[in-house]
């Protein structure tokens, strides 16, 4: 008896989408996904359009032909198919990570172009076990949040849901399914190349591991992650726990922080460091412990710089403070029609007809700007503006946001951006991301 498409896909609610993107490389996992998904969608009264997308990473001479063969197979079975190519220069280091980033960027663009609400991938139970073992080897201990491994659901770029419905299905079960259907697959030789981390793990520790035991450890890590998240969600429900000013400095109530468990404190302060620094990931486990020790008064320094964030311990009842450090702040062009993220902290939309440069103001430049506009800003607020974006036009400082009554160009909109959540949001953290956004908000107010 074969696999049940209904049991596999029904929990994901794919029927509410206009279209569904299936990521298909031509390997057994993705082809198994494609044909099971096709069968499932055929059971729906008004099924979404199924579009198979093959990303050609241009890393092997055979990849173009393999992508073409996937297209021929799809044509034979009445499935829409397109090929997207990663044509950018390839990095000398971190190739696998760069390829993964490019792949998801291309898949998200394909989903947006097609109006698809879902991208569905063929990650299997085997991949889940390998992911756990890889992350455990990197972290060096059994309490890392990443040991919850891959979430069945994630949100990409704030708009497209990533579904991994095969995380409880083995690779062999998919191959048996394809064999039963008479469908051949291609084995990518890079999957056996031990120069890459995953093949090393697959051919090494994963081959020797007790799969059921690993899956139990994944479940335990997931439960621990949910407990820490739930503690933060509860804390964030109290408005007194966390505040933020217009420029993004955050104020963490020291008593509320101290009342949390050590694990929740490490998560909370690490999360705020990531937000303040505009980073897409949490600081490492060791860095999170270091922040927690400093804020809890166990280490002597009253301030730390971590992940681009300056963190200061509050004394005598004062809140702990998290803000961006004043280094490595970017300069970006903002042209008409553009949507751009600045420093991982602010999102700009330009629907007007003027072009600008986004950059932090220089100190004397800001002082002169404030003087010429008749404003007197105290030093603390001035420091906040020095780590904030300003708009330059023709090489001159033209607009400074967050000032009371400040002029602002027509058609330019700015809002807060959470890099750690807004690009890839694992389903494990959906509730936590919602709680953070509810407490900090997206709107940018005036400096007060």
UniProtKB/Swiss-Prot annotation:
It catalyses: cytidine(34) in tRNA(Ile2) + L-lysine + ATP = lysidine(34) in tRNA(Ile2) + AMP + diphosphate + H(+). Pfam families: ATP_bind_3. One of its GO terms (molecular function) is tRNA(Ile)-lysidine synthase activity. Its EC number is 6.3.4.19. The keyword Plastid does not apply. The keyword Cytoplasm applies. Belongs to the tRNA(Ile)-lysidine synthase family. This is tRNA(Ile)-lysidine synthase.
